[in-house]
Amino acid sequence: MKVTAVPAVIKPYESAEAIVQVSVQNGYHINANPPTFSYLKATELTLEQVPGISVSFIVYPNALTKSFPFAEKPLAVYEGTTEIKVRLRADKSLTPSIQTLPGSLHVQACDNQVCYTPGTLAVSIPLSIK
């Protein structure tokens, strides 16, 4: 699994959208947010606090609904490459600079037979303050 972030450009006292791309290998999927069953680990993006930058909201992609031999009903999942959108707001006191918004992507990967132990991947969103 690979996680990358599209650089975001933001101006003081304005909003911008950052995109975190999640690429899941063929033959695997990760649970959607929200997951179908409460015992499954949802894909969840958490971001650290950076002075002058606030996260307004996070938008998870629409899930695919697929049937698997190990599940009693179809599951909401992400496969292939999918995007998580992050709405950011910059404080008016920010000065032009390059910053990084660090975070973590919490996922539970599965194949067509079984779900694996949940894991965490590092995320780093490049920010250009204009």
Language-model features: locations:
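Extracellular/lumen-exposed scaffold segments
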Residues: 1-130
